[in-house]
Amino acid sequence: MYRRFAAALLSALLLSPGWLGMTGFTQLIGFVPLLWISSSYEGGRRNWWRMFGWAALTFVLWNAMTIWWIWNATPVGPVAATLASTTLNMIAFMLFHTVSKKGPKALAYTLLVAGWIATEYWYTVGEFSW
């Protein structure tokens, strides 16, 4: 459990600097700890929910680290932005996790990339104003 917590935290820490204007290089390996957590679970409903929890923790931490500045405008803003961004991230990642347990790995990774690009596109062209 502590290894998974450390991996979720490490993943969030590696993904954050690119959005904070520091460096984007850490994003290249930012998903590796989260993918390790996913690979450590077998298929099944209980394990799906466990992975959901670790992924949600990772994405909530990542989003909280990158959109904290919205607090300057309104206290409700960062909470709403974190929930909305986390939901979009979770759609793509949990689709990957589900397919990786039931189908070919190549299809799962293709869906992760395609799903992530689709949710980022939706996020970019949507009416999100943060």
Stretch-by-stretch model annotation:
Residues 1-130:
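Membrane-embedded alpha-helical bundles of multi-pass enzymes
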